[in-house]
């Protein structure tokens, strides 16, 4: 074949890039280079690109070919080139006559899928090359002294390609570096392809952009305002997160979406689609609920904490499980039981001492008093669960006291937390019926937490005025200009251009809107976790904004402010974030929500023999704004190999670096703002799960619980309008129920223990439906008082129609 070849080169090959190569090692990225061969006689080798699945070479080679020549381009991993499989990463074969006419001349850009070798090793990805008969321009490889040519019969005879300048130390990282385009200050990033997964699901790499727009091999990246489907609509930008997932930024509305805007872009249609997508995301978010946490209606109705221990609980218990004390059944006369003594307080109140147990009680042991507990059977009717005399229950726990109301109803005082409750602490079964242990513990922790002096609202008012369409910036200016002590005063929110007094509803709306805005990935402060696309984690590259630490302090203040004023944020974080807030040590299990691939790889490392399999050191690779650097996990870590003996330490250090160290500055700024309102020693009473509930409330809507804890004014529960109302609510999906709740209470969140703990402007306030308004009018809400003014609609269809319009179309919150 060589005799048929021209004497001089007649074709220029430009090996531009590869995209989405297969990652064979658990941790290490390959060091790819390409070898081009024509007929087994002409061989050319590119330079080595270190540690990447998306190498960019853009190197030119002049070839002597004819129409029947076969051009073979193979890709290898330089670190494994001397091993049996030579680190093979894929090959393409091109017959020259099939793609270009040498006589007529031409210029062809090719993107070919990489193929397997005879060894059938798994390969993946694409190779982008350019073939041109125009050799008039200088060969830049030759000009730079990078041209390598070998005349030999095989490509496996010990090629030693030139290595591009880079760190030669092996490093471990189970995740690709974060794409700097996700946080480019110009909001016009040039995409650097990067992925952690064997298969690339992202849009074509920047090299592909070069392939599509340059016929001479000069590097021209695919702009962030276009992708493989063409140019994005005006104001849209394509970005990629640190996990290689492509998302789109709408600068017109400052929102992000996973869905590519259609080519026939319509602002109204896109707005509707964005709203629909937001509700779908909200619906998925609201479905996050612990499987066993569906008995909120059955948990006892403990009163709010009292600042004075002697104040008895007020009001009755309307719970499915309740405790009731009967009056005396026998006369309090005769001799006291053995070991008992009656004494009198200085105020003249009698009490009784049991010398057998060294305890005291207000209850006369001669008056046989029974504690009955009621629960609901499968039919929903009350049945007695337990009945036993008080005298058989034993002593109260340390610091507890039993007292009686004026109506002889027993209540209990916990002097440890200065709180009161109807529940006898000696009767855990009164709480156990269908109520998870963690919920009982959380409720008592919450009572203690809120009773502390540091959590008491100070005298005075804290006024915050914001614009709905500029809530992030306005809130930042308002909250950061005030001292922590001012923020502890009664919060008074004012929306610009809207009339109304804040009795609680406006502040709930404020936190709902602000949480959606400040956690938006558009601002590059937070990003979606690896576990899903709604839980959040700190963006390690938030430093693109020079003021990012001030913003994190602001966000910490907002979270603390919400907890302090008993409001909820409509956001959830990865589990590790809550652990970090509690200063707990993160574990490998926490890695799953941060980087699923790395979690799987680290787990494999712990469970398998890695000697001779993995070439790891106590270091990791990190990329920041295009600069790749090697970070030691311990002093001199890049020179310390990982063995079976020290791999547990390695896994621990990688986990700590990935979750904690990378965002340490941002997190410390967040906590500095948070602790200005919530002392660290107080929040530490909760565990990470409880802290999540404390910040976000529960994320599901139990209609039965809602109905159970609803009051009526002008209506009765049996009225047809009320029956139709609940029928409509049950027929609605989760998103519509959430919007109804937001319409009526100012937030889509409900308290941890269900609707019985719903808060109003003056403390606990049940949801109320009032008969008010003309049947031709829409329902009206009073979010400060959790009240819905519902006109007496004549039919189910009318009620459903009017409710839908009111809930879906209402934006402002006009309060009385």
Curated annotation (Swiss-Prot):
Function: E3 ubiquitin-protein ligase which accepts ubiquitin from an E2 ubiquitin-conjugating enzyme in the form of a thioester and then directly transfers the ubiquitin to targeted substrates. Probably involved in the regulatory network controlling carbon source utilization.
UniProt GO BP: cellular response to heat; cellular response to L-arginine; chromatin organization; free ubiquitin chain polymerization; mitochondria-associated ubiquitin-dependent protein catabolic process; mitochondrion organization; nonfunctional rRNA decay; poly(A)+ mRNA export from nucleus
Active site annotation, chain numbering: 784 (glycyl thioester intermediate)
Main location: cytoplasm
Biased composition (Low complexity): 160-178, 193-213, 325-334
Protein name (Swiss-Prot/TrEMBL): Probable E3 ubiquitin-protein ligase hulA
Top-level taxon: Eukaryota
Signal peptide segment: none
Species, as recorded: Neosartorya fischeri (strain ATCC 1020 / DSM 3700 / CBS 544.65 / FGSC A1164 / JCM 1740 / NRRL 181 / WB 181)
Family: Belongs to the RSP5/NEDD4 family.
UniProt keyword terms in alphabetical order: Cytoplasm, Repeat, Transferase, Ubl conjugation pathway
Residues annotated as domain C2: 1-112
Quaternary organization: Interacts with creD.
Pathway terms, separated by semicolons: Protein modification; protein ubiquitination
Coiled-coil residue windows: none
Location of the WW domain: 230-263, 334-367, 394-427
Location(s) in or outside the cell: Cytoplasm
Region called Disordered, residue ranges: 134-238, 254-354
Catalytic reaction equation(s): S-ubiquitinyl-[E2 ubiquitin-conjugating enzyme]-L-cysteine + [acceptor protein]-L-lysine = [E2 ubiquitin-conjugating enzyme]-L-cysteine + N(6)-ubiquitinyl-[acceptor protein]-L-lysine
Domain HECT: 483-816
SMART domains xref list: C2, HECTc, WW
Biased composition (Polar residues): 181-192, 214-227, 254-267, 296-310
């Amino acid at each position: 074949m060589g005799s048929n070849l021209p004497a001089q080169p007649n074709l220029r090959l430009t090996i531009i890039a590869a995209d989405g190569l297969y990652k064979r090692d658990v941790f290490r990225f390959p060091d790819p280079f390409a070898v081009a061969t024509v007929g087994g006689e002409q061989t050319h080798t590119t330079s080595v690109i270190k540690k990447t699945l998306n190498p960019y070479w853009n190197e030119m080679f002049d070839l002597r070919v004819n129409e029947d020549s076969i051009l073979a381009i193979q890709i290898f991993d330089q670190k494994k080139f001397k091993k049996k499989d030579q680190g093979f990463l894929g090959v393409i074969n091109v017959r020259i006559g099939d793609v270009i006419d040498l006589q007529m001349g031409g210029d062809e850009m090719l993107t070919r899928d990489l193929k397997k070798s005879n060894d059938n090793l798994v390969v993946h990805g694409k190779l982008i090359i350019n073939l041109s008969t125009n050799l008039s321009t200088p060969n830049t490889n030759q000009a730079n002294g990078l041209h390598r040519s070998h005349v030999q019969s095989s490509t496996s005879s010990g090629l030693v390609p030139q290595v591009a300048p880079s760190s030669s130390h092996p490093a471990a990282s189970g995740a690709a570096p974060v794409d700097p385009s996700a946080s480019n200050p110009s909001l016009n990033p040039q995409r650097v392809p990067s992925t952690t997964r064997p298969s690339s699901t992202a849009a074509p790499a920047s090299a592909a952009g070069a392939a599509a727009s340059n016929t001479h091999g000069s590097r021209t990246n695919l702009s962030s305002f276009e992708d493989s489907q063409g140019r994005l609509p005006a104001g849209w930008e394509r970005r990629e997160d640190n996990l290689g997932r492509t998302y789109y930024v709408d600068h017109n509305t400052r929102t992000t979406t996973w869905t590519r805007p259609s080519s026939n872009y319509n602002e109204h249609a896109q707005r509707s689609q964005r709203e629909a997508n937001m509700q779908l995301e909200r619906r998925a978010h609201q479905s996050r609920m612990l499987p066993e946490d569906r008995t909120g209606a059955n948990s006892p109705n403990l009163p709010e904490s009292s600042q004075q221990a002697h104040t008895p609980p007020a009001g009755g218990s309307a719970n499915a499980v309740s405790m009731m004390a009967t009056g005396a059944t026998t006369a309090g006369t005769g001799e006291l039981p053995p070991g008992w003594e009656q004494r009198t307080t200085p105020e003249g109140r009698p009490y009784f001492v049991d010398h057998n147990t060294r305890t005291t009680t207000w209850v006369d042991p001669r008056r046989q008093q029974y504690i009955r507990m009621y629960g609901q059977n499968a039919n929903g009717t009350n049945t007695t669960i337990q009945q036993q005399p008080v005298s058989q229950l034993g002593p109260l726990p340390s610091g507890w006291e039993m007292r009686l109301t004026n109506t002889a109803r027993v209540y209990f005082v916990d002097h440890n937390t200065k709180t009161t409750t109807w529940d006898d602490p000696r009767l855990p079964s009164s709480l156990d019926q269908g109520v998870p242990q963690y919920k009982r513990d959380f409720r008592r922790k919450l009572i203690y937490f809120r009773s502390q002096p540091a959590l008491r609202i100070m005298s005075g008012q804290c006024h915050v005025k914001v614009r709905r369409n500029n809530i992030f910036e306005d809130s930042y200016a308002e909250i950061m200009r005030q001292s922590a002590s001012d923020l502890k005063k009664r919060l008074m929110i004012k929306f610009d251009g809207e009339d109304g007094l804040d009795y609680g509803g406006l502040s709930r709306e404020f936190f709902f809107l602000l949480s959606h805005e400040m956690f938006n990935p558009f601002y590059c402060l937070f990003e979606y976790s690896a576990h899903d696309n709604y839980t959040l984690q700190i963006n390690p590259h938030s430093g693109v904004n020079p003021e990012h630490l001030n913003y994190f302090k602001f966000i910490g203040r907002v979270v603390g402010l919400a907890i302090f004023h008993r409001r909820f944020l409509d956001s959830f974080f990865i589990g590790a974030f809550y652990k970090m807030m509690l200063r707990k040590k993160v574990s490998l299990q926490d890695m799953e929500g941060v980087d699923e691939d790395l979690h799987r790889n680290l787990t494999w490392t712990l469970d398998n023999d890695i000697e001779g399999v993995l070439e790891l050191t106590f270091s990791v690779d990190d990329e920041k704004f295009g600069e790749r650097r090697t970070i030691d996990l311990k002093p001199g870590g890049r020179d310390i190999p990982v063995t079976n003996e020290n791999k547990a330490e390695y896994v621990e250090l990688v986990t700590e670096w990935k979750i904690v160290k990378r965002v340490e500055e941002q997190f410390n700024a967040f906590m500095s703002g948070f602790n200005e309102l919530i002392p660290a020693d107080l929040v530490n009473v909760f565990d990470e799960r409880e802290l999540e509930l404390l910040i976000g409330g529960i994320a599901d809507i139990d209609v039965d619980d809602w109905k159970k804890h609803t009051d009526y004014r002008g209506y009765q529960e049996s009225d047809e309008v009320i029956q139709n109302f609940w029928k409509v609510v049950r027929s609605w999906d989760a998103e519509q129920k959430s919007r109804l709740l937001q319409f009526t209470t100012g937030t889509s969140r409900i308290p941890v223990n269900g609707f019985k703990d719903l808060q109003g402007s003056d403390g606990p306030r049940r949801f109320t439906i009032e008969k008010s308004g003309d049947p031709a009018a829409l329902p009206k809400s009073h979010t400060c008082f959790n009240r819905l003014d519902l006109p007496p609609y004549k039919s189910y269809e009318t009620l459903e129609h009017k409710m839908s319009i009111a809930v879906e179309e209402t934006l402002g919150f006009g309060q009385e």
